[in-house]
From Swiss-Prot:
Main location: nucleus
Gene of this entry: Foxr2
Signal sequence, renumbered to the chain: none
SMART domains: FH
InterPro entries referenced in this protein's UniProt entry, alphabetically: Fork_head_dom, FOX_transcription_regulators, WH-like_DNA-bd_sf, WH_DNA-bd_sf
Cellular compartments per GO CC: nucleoplasm
Lineage: Eukaryota, Metazoa, Chordata, Craniata, Vertebrata
Subcellular location: Nucleus
Name the record gives this protein: Forkhead box protein R2
GO molecular function, one term: DNA-binding transcription factor activity
Residues in the DNA-binding region annotation: 183-285
Domain of life: Eukaryota
The species this protein was found in: Mus musculus (Mouse)
DNA-binding is among the record's keywords: yes
Keywords: DNA-binding, Nucleus, Transcription, Transcription regulation
Keyword Nucleotide-binding: no
Amino acid sequence: MDVKVKNRDFWYSLHGQVPGMLDWDMGNEFFLPCTMDQCSFAEQSLAKYKIQLTKPPALPQKKKSNFDDDGPPAEPSLWMWVNPNIVCPINSKEAPNTIHKILPSAPFPQTGESDYLGTQRMVQSLSVLHTEHHQQQKLLIYSTAPDFIEEETKEQECTSSKKYSKKHTVCHGPHREKESWPRPPLNYSHLVALALKSSPSCGLNVQQIYNFTRQHFPYFRTAPEGWKNTIRHNLCSLTCFEKVPVDLEDEPDGKPRSFLWKLTDEGNRFFQEDTRVLAYARRESIKQSMRQPELIDLLFHL
């Protein structure tokens, strides 16, 4: 290490010695919140005054043996001057080569043929044990794999059968139920007119109209209950339908009088001119929404 100083011999002669900074009171310096060189001049004067009044505690210092035979005997200190060439010597000024060389494999020590053969047998036995352990793990994996596959297939079959039973339910009669039915392309007035036109001459009550709609158009079996209010609103607000009382002869004594709904003359024209024309135009979509699509000609008088 090349230390760039003017008088090298003088500085090198101070190796391991404490040439200066001996008047720095380190004992009192430890009690200060900051070093004195960081304070202002007034604070430095005050600190020096306090130092004069306060005596630092006596710190026992024992001389230690010097293990460095090259330099003079000295006690290590905070301000000790050292020669870097002695403390951390460097052989060459060039940076060491950092390329790692691959070392050849060390041969077996030639202590004897018997030792070499014993070592060779030990290595072979270890390799055989490793391969046997690896093969046992493979056998365990392959032996448990078919059972695991069978359990998975059984679970899949059970889940698929449950899904199939939920989706494909058989109803009463020759017709199979669908998972979801489309909404018929008809207004509620058309549905009411269709139900009353297919009824006997005496008419139908509100519950019978509900049953007719659910029977031929299964969409309303799972639809929200609001469609019933819409049908009642059409019955009461449109002039195509009228409410007629039931004959007294048909009613038993002691029960309130009931009413039936029928088509008026305007309602019959509405069925012929509007409902039948709509059935001609949307025949296929209506058949898809019907539970018995073969009855479309009979219901709509096509």
